[in-house]
Amino acid sequence: MNSHFASAHTPFYINTKEARYLVLKAVKVCDVRTVECEGSKA
């Protein structure tokens, strides 16, 4: 579990498939949040 915290400090230093998947998942969440924020403003 600590590996997740370590990867958070170095998001660009990831080469593992699992870590890469986590990053993509995080990016997806951010995109969804952005869309929700834009929708709320509109």
UniProtKB/Swiss-Prot annotation:
Keywords: DNA-binding, Late protein, Phosphoprotein. GO terms for biological process: viral protein processing. GO terms for molecular function: DNA binding. It holds the Pfam family Pox_F17. Disulfide bonds: none annotated. Belongs to the orthopoxvirus OPG062 family. This is Truncated phosphoprotein OPG062. The gene is OPG062.
